[in-house]
Structures are given as structure tokens and as C-alpha cells.
A protein has these predicted regions:
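Conserved acetyl-CoA-binding loop-helix of GNAT-fold acetyltransferases
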Residues: 131-134, 140-153, 177
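Conserved beta-hairpin
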Residues: 54-76, 133-135
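Active-site rim helix/loop that mediates acceptor-substrate recognition in acyltransferases
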Residues: 38-61
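Conserved beta-strand-loop-alpha-helix junction that forms the acyl-donor binding cleft
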Residues: 130-139, 163-172
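Conserved GNAT acetyl-CoA-binding A-motif
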Residues: 125-127, 154-167
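Conserved acyl-donor/pantetheine-binding loop and adjacent beta-alpha core of acyl/acetyltransferases
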Residues: 72-133, 139
């Protein structure tokens, strides 16, 4: 297979990226827990994905495939966090209204748990792989691995570790193949 071109996501690609992530995560354990109603999950997930990708683009940590966008990697970049201004500009500040009270409380509970691991089990500074999603029609073709490469290469150059969390046991083999190790198994 030839090399898959991966680029910094452009703001013109955010809408497509949000739809792809919503498709990729519509059956994910995290979002099925947060948004248990399958009839409302996709639109809420699409809003969240677009807003989160936009905020992360403003912070400089989103990579994607060239047009058409078929995969996205959202990274937390050391020294370039998503700020309150990014959240406000992107619409993330309206997430409680988009999700509804119960779903937003479940979301915050999960995020707070994951954030509690940083510093305790996760060294800082680090690169944080927040979201890696590939359109279901394009999975299994090497896009996920290609999407990881720019940030992994930069982290290696900077001598910094990378961190992610997954609730999907089926994803562990993929991440291990790309150099990640399990630090915490909190099943």
C-alpha cells in the first residue's frame, strides 16, 4: 500500500470530520454510556465531535486525511491546551444543552475519572491522543496507523511520551502495535 497523506486538519474540513467521528463512535462504549438513547445519540455525538474538533484545531492538534476526510486524530499538544476561548468559539461551552443534563453529568464523570490519572499514572508533559476515528467504510486499511504517525514522530523527537485511554478491549492490540503500553487496567 502506498503512503497515506496525513495533514493538519483545515477548518473547512471540520464539518466532515465531525460527521465521520460520529459515525465511527456511534456504537462506542463511552458514548453509548454517555448517550444511551440510540435515537438521539448520533446528532448529539455529531455536535460534540464538530465542536471538539474545532476547539482542538484552534489549539493545533488535529490531523486528518486529505479530502475527502476519512479519518481524524485529535491530539492534546504539550504547551498548547484547548482554552476557554477555544471552547466558547467552538460551541463546546454549549455541550450541556446539546447533551442534556443526565448525559452531560455522565460525560463529566468519565472525563473527570480519566483526568484523575494524569500525574498519578501518566507522566507529564505528554502528547495526549484524545480521539482517533476512521469512517467505518474505511476501517482496516491502515488509516488509523497513518493518522498516529505525525504526532508520534514529533513526540519521539521531543523525547515525550504519548498517552491515550480506551474502553474498548478490541483496540488494545492496535495501540500496542503502534508502541503504546498499558499503564492502568481499571476493569
Amino acid at each position: 500500500m502506498s503512503a497515506i497523506p496525513i495533514v493538519k486538519l483545515k477548518t473547512s474540513q471540520i464539518e466532515a470530520a465531525g460527521t465521520i467521528l460520529a459515525r465511527a463512535f456511534s456504537e462506542d462504549s463511552f458514548f453509548s454510556y454517555v448517550l444511551p438513547d440510540p435515537d438521539t445519540r448520533f446528532p448529539a455525538l455529531e455536535y460534540y465531535s464538530r465542536s471538539y474538533v474545532y476547539a482542538s484545531c484552534l489549539a493545533g492538534g488535529v490531523y486528518g486525511t486529505l479530502d475527502p476526510v476519512t479519518g481524524i486524530a485529535v491530539w492534546g499538544v504539550p504547551g498548547s491546551p484547548v482554552t476557554l476561548e477555544h471552547r466558547n468559539r467552538s460551541g463546546l461551552d454549549r455541550l450541556p444543552e446539546s447533551f442534556g443534563t443526565g448525559a452531560y453529568q455522565r460525560y463529566k464523570h468519565m472525563v473527570d475519572f480519566f483526568e484523575s490519572l494524569i500525574g498519578r499514572d501518566v507522566p507529564t508533559p505528554h502528547w495526549y491522543l484524545s480521539i482517533l476515528g476512521v469512517d467505518p467504510d474505511h476501517q482496516g486499511k491502515g488509516l488509523g496507523g497513518a493518522l498516529l504517525q505525525p504526532a508520534l514522530a514529533q513526540a519521539d523527537e521531543d523525547g515525550l511520551p504519548c498517552y491515550l485511554e480506551t474502553l474498548e478491549e478490541k483496540n488494545l492490540g492496535f495501540y500496542v502495535r503502534h508502541g503504546f503500553e498499558v499503564l492502568v487496567d481499571d476493569r
